[in-house]
Amino acid sequence: RQRQMCIRDRRMMDACADFGRAVVVLDRPNPNGSYIDGPVLDMKYKSGVGALPIPVVHGLTMGEIARMAVGEGWAKPCDLTVVKCRNYTHATEYLLPVAPSPNLPTARAVYLYAALCPFEGTVVSLGRGTDKPFEMYGHPDMTGRTFSFTPRPTAGAKHPPLEGRLCRGVDLSGMPLAEAREVGFSLRYVIDACADLEMGDKFFTPMFEKLVGVGWVREMILAGASEAEIR
């Protein structure tokens, strides 16, 4: 849900409806399209990183989201055509032939995105400014960690969080792809970092609620709840 493509598509559909233009979506597979996970967006947290009331991992293709947006009234009625993908089902294991973003350079990063994206709403780095963004996390004050990295300016992150500071944390880049594909919207990593840093509410920023889509996840993490209890 946090990726901005579906938000831009909905805005384009609204603009086409206003000007009487047809919309044609050439559909593509979703590499995380085999499951649904995470909270449905509470629309009071609607923002540029979440504008539709769908789960964090929605499992839909762009064409399916476009149809749903029109059908549910989330987008203005428009002349919509979706050109379907041949031989694709939601059980298809699909590896993207081209990286969708400089910050999602590998299949592992794509699979771990849902679990690591909430760090964008915390003081922790998720590896922007390294060669393995979304495959690690860390902070200068994390303790008892042997892995370290230092964020530097890159093509995909000119001024990454914690730029130039040595961060200690966790390296997930060696996780087998099959295991990474099963992680889903896991809060285990955020809970781990929050407990380690012992910063209380200062661990989070207002962006956290916009990313997870609800207000009670932060509260439960700070109360010491486990991932299973939060789910």
Regions found by a protein language model. Give the residues of each.
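A short helix->loop->beta-strand "cap" motif at the edges of active sites that frequently abuts
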Residues: 18-22
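Short, small-residue-biased leader/transition segments that mark boundaries at the very start
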Residues: 2-7
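Conserved anion/nucleotide-ligand pocket segment
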Residues: 45-116
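Glycine-rich, aromatic-lined ligand/substrate-binding cores of catalytic
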Residues: 87-163
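Conserved functional hotspot residues or short segments at active or partner-binding sites
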Residues: 133-231
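Active-site-proximal beta-strand/loop segments in catalytic clefts of secreted hydrolases
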Residues: 1, 26-29, 85-86, 139, ...
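Glycine-rich, charge-decorated loop segments at or immediately adjacent to ligand/cofactor-binding or catalytic sites
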Residues: 24-46
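Structural recognition of the beta-strand scaffold that forms the well-ordered cores
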Residues: 24-25, 82, 135
